């Protein structure tokens, strides 16, 4: 007896446009039904999954993530080079989670948390749960116990590289124990993933990068802890320091760019740039200035900045200082910026100056003269 034919499978390649569109929609619907939402989407589509989120403290990064922050009940990886701003970003997420009324735990495997800096970034250190485990298995067991309590909204583990397996700590320095940390992470994440989703607890892993030895083609760096974290993470963010923020000749912060290298809840590969000021964290005012200039809310002419036809300073640092001491002006800029964002993208066509317009008029006159000469010659 012949096998029953699946009517949803075409006999040959579909060539007409309407047929292709319908077939793609049907296939995407089947994938979503069979495997869950978020596994397939059009890269350029603006729609995202209806997922609750925790803001990151950066307006630009919240936009890049597509849902207004990091998703709840998921695993997040923040990775990058040393002193790139990974922990600072995680501390801002902690502060935002606490503002929402959430309970947060910080598992400090590196034993390097600075409570003074955390407080300066807005973290309520009196309410922050902190653990400094002795080895990797202990750290993940503590995390799992906290998740299963059903009372924790966010757990941050700093860092994956410091989650050293007990066997490695108890062993000799000369012992060759390959893949212990990778196996530890794989086993721990398998156990954690289901509970995180069940209790809507977000877990952020801070990770470091390492150079690949003997690589000629492809990426020259990788993250620690094996491949399990890459697989189980719903969102992965790479943090890079791009430059230094200066006030005169004095460095006062870092220019940072974050690339969303993986995103299961919205289209990935978006980037966000912002400034991290020493001792203060992410500069919200700096982000507002950049966004306002991009939307023509604040007009930049050379080094001068103006708002509503009134000069507000020369140089970005002076504008930042002016907005910080003048909350009413900052509120007006924010209001106009929100209205500009709601209107959609700014027309990128360059506005012609009087000189350019005059030049265009001259060119038109020359063309008319040339046309007249050609007609006479004919």
UniProtKB/Swiss-Prot annotation:
Residues 359-378 have a biased composition (Acidic residues). InterPro entries: AAA+_ATPase, DNA_recomb/repair_RecA, DNA_recomb/repair_RecA_CS, P-loop_NTPase, RecA-like_C, RecA-like_N, RecA_ATP-bd, RecA_C_sf. GO terms for molecular function: ATP binding; ATP hydrolysis activity; ATP-dependent DNA damage sensor activity; damaged DNA binding; single-stranded DNA binding. It is found in: Cytoplasm. One of its GO terms (cellular component) is cytoplasm. Keywords: ATP-binding, Cytoplasm, DNA damage, DNA recombination, DNA repair, DNA-binding, Nucleotide-binding, SOS response. It holds the Pfam family RecA. ATP binds at residues 80-87. The keyword ATP-binding applies. GO terms for biological process: DNA recombination; DNA repair; SOS response. Residues 1-20, 344-378 are annotated as: Disordered. The keyword Nucleotide-binding applies. It comes from the Bacteria. HAMAP family: RecA. Can catalyze the hydrolysis of ATP in the presence of single-stranded DNA, the ATP-dependent uptake of single-stranded DNA by duplex DNA, and the ATP-dependent hybridization of homologous single-stranded DNAs. It interacts with LexA causing its activation and leading to its autocatalytic cleavage. Belongs to the RecA family. NCBIfam families: tigrfam_recA. This is Protein RecA. It comes from Fusobacterium nucleatum subsp. nucleatum (strain ATCC 25586 / DSM 15643 / BCRC 10681 / CIP 101130 / JCM 8532 / KCTC 2640 / LMG 13131 / VPI 4355).
């Amino acid at each position: 007896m012949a096998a029953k034919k699946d009517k949803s499978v075409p006999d040959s390649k579909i060539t007409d446009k309407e047929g292709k569109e319908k077939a793609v929609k049907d296939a995407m619907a089947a994938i979503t039904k069979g495997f869950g939402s978020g596994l397939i989407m059009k890269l350029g589509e603006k729609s995202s999954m209806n997922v609750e989120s925790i803001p990151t403290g950066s307006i630009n990064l919240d936009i890049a993530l597509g849902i207004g922050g990091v998703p709840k009940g998921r695993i997040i990886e923040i990775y990058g080079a040393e002193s790139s701003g990974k922990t600072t970003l995680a501390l801002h997420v902690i502060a935002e989670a606490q503002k929402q009324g959430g309970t947060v735990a910080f598992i400090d495997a590196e034993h390097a948390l600075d409570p003074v800096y955390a407080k300066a970034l807005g973290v309520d250190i009196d309410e922050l749960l902190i653990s400094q485990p002795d080895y990797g298995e202990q750290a993940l067991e503590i995390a799992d116990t906290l998740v299963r309590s059903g009372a924790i909204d966010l757990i941050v583990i700093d860092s994956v590289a410091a989650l050293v397996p007990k066997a490695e700590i108890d062993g000799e320095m000369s012992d060759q124990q390959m893949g212990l940390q990778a196996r530890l992470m794989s086993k721990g994440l398998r156990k954690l993933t289901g509970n995180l989703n069940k209790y809507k607890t977000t877990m952020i892993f801070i990770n470091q990068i390492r150079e690949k030895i003997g690589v000629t083609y492809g990426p020259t760096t990788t993250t620690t802890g094996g491949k399990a974290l890459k697989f189980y993470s719903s969102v992965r963010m790479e943090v890079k320091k791009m430059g230094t923020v200066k006030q005169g000749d004095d460095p006062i912060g870092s220019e940072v760019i974050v690339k969303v290298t993986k995103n299961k809840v919205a289209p990935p590969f978006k980037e966000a740039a912002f400034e991290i000021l020493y001792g203060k964290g992410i500069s919200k005012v700096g982000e507002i200035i950049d966004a306002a200039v991009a939307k023509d809310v604040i007009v930049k002419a050379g080094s001068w900045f103006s708002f509503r036809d009134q000069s507000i300073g020369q140089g970005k640092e002076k504008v930042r200082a002016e907005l910080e001491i003048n909350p009413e002006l900052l509120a007006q800029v924010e209001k106009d910026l929100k209205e500009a964002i709601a209107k959609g993208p700014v027309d990128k066509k360059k506005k012609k100056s009087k000189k350019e317009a005059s030049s265009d008029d001259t060119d038109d006159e020359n063309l008319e003269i040339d046309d007249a000469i050609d007609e006479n010659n004919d």
